[in-house]
């Protein structure tokens, strides 16, 4: 786990918890691992969430197992870039989550390679798309169910409460 870095603004990141009826989503911005662990241990004050926005582009300085595993999300969306994010250690943490979650990515990650990227249908932007950009859309319902859609290929998955 990374040591506390003095003067790093990421250590001052705030986390947000969004709720719409029974649907719950968390976003911890660029929060660093040591802050995540301090937040979640020894007791998890957040509880579980349905959807987690992956922290810090999926970099290994964030996305601790203490946070991801305690939240038990059904899905996560990682706002990575083609050359930034989805560190192999982070991919292992998400794949090992007790919630059995799906990982959705904004971009195919050259850093992660074939082994650690999500399956193609879960990736909004593949390699070298000639400046085309696609989004990932989330539609949440008050009953706690939600649907995630990859706007590049119209792949959709609905998660139940």
Briefly describe each language-model feature range.
Residues 7-11, 29, 33-129:
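Cap/insert and terminal regions of metallo-dependent hydrolase folds
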């Amino acid at each position: 786990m990374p040591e506390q870095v003095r003067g790093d603004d990421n250590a001052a990141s705030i986390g947000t918890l969004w709720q719409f009826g029974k649907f719950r989503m968390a976003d911890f911005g660029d929060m660093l691992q040591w802050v995540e662990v301090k937040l979640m241990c020894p007791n998890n004050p957040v509880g579980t969430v349905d959807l987690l926005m992956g922290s810090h582009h999926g970099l290994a300085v964030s996305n601790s197992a203490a946070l991801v595993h305690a939240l038990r999300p059904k899905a996560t969306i990682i706002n990575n870039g083609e050359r930034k994010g989805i560190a192999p250690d982070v991919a292992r943490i998400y794949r090992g989550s007790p919630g059995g979650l799906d990982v959705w990515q904004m971009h195919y990650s050259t850093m992660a390679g074939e082994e650690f990227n999500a399956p193609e249908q879960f990736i909004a932007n593949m390699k070298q798309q000639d400046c085309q950009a696609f989004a990932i859309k989330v539609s949440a319902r008050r009953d706690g169910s939600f649907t995630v859609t990859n706007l590049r290929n119209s792949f959709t998955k609905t998660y139940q409460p």
